[in-house]
Amino acid sequence: MLISHSDLNQQLKSAGIGFNATELHGFLSGLLCGGLKDQSWLPLLYQFSNDNHAYPTALVQPVTELYEKISQTLSDVEGFTFGLGLTEDENVFAQADSLSDWANQFLLGLGLAQPELAKEKGEIGEAVDDLQDICQLGYNEDDNEEELAEALEEIIEYVRTIAMLFYSHFNEGEIESKPVLH
């Protein structure tokens, strides 16, 4: 069974890891969407979240399971089951911060997997620009929470779509297609 967001957060914090669960999800998603297919994800994760030190053994299994779950949901394009792994906190401001954290780490992972990402044009280039804007997502504490929640919901759906766009672009031939039943 996949570890909960809050349990993973606690384990990462206890181990002194530089990512929270949302940032970890974003980073791993970025690597996968960028087409990384080998085991180099683990050394990259250690390098960027723990000063090149391996994670404690007890943390490697849940992180590996998360990586595999993200990979599975990304490859299920038709089911569109990919989620962003944002905070479980229902506060809209915490959700907005979580989305910004996720997008920042997603771009880092994507850029590591695709070093020439800045040269991309067309819809991929536009999607990168949009994600960079989302990383700068801001709000005022006195913003209308209901309006912010609605806007955030739309942005989250857009980011899910962007992630799938990157995945299908950089992982051609890896997409799971289900047979059409007549």
Curated annotation (Swiss-Prot):
One of its GO terms (cellular component) is cytosol. It comes from the Bacteria. Disulfide bonds: none annotated. It holds the Pfam family UPF0149. Transmembrane segments: none annotated. InterPro entries: YgfB-like (IPR011978), YgfB-like_sf (IPR036255). PANTHER family: UPF0149 PROTEIN YGFB (PTHR37528:SF1). Belongs to the UPF0149 family. NCBIfam families: PRK01736.1, ygfB_yecA. This is UPF0149 protein CGSHiEE_07975. It comes from Haemophilus influenzae (strain PittEE).
